[in-house]
Design a protein with these regions (language model features):
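Arg/Lys-rich, low-complexity, intrinsically disordered N-terminal tails that contact nucleic acids
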Residues: 1-9, 134-137
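Short cysteine/histidine-rich zinc-coordinating motifs and their immediately flanking basic loops
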Residues: 36-45, 72-80
């Protein structure tokens, strides 16, 4: 059985894809809003709750690039400091327990829905490029 997709996963994924203007981070293909051909690629598996909702750990990737590159985009797109920070988060057992306790609901889900709504508002106002996202913690 695969990893269950929670409401927080849904809103986080939409936030990442909207923040990057529905553009694949590898090949640069731009997709229409809500297109199912663009995934939210996680550098470290969504099974790790400490990094599951980290913006450092996620980039949009089309299905083909996601399959080819998997999480290897981290080496290409993140700085040494960002990769080290992500490793620290990955190994933080207490953080993972705290995130897991939410079960991807409540405040966590609400936060990522708000981030998605803020991205949509920015796009409606004509803001282009990559949009900043605020981490939950």
């Amino acid at each position: 059985m695969g990893i269950k997709i929670t409401m927080a996963d849904k809103w986080f994924s939409l936030s990442i894809r909207e923040a990057y203007d529905w553009t694949c981070c590898r090949c640069g293909t731009k997709y229409h809003h809500n297109h199912q051909g663009l995934d939210c690629s996680h550098g470290y598996s969504r099974g790790n709750w400490a990094t599951r909702f980290s913006t450092l750990n996620a980039r949009p990737a089309c299905m083909g690039c996601h399959r080819i590159e998997s999480g290897h985009w981290m080496e290409r797109l993140l700085t040494d400091w960002e990769r080290e920070r992500l490793r620290e988060l990955r190994d933080d057992v207490q953080l993972a327990k705290m995130y897991r306790k939410t079960k991807g609901k409540g405040e966590l889900s609400k936060h990522w829905k708000q981030q998605y709504d803020l991205c949509l508002q920015a796009r409606e106002c004509g803001v282009t490029g990559v949009l900043p996202l605020e981490e939950w913690l």
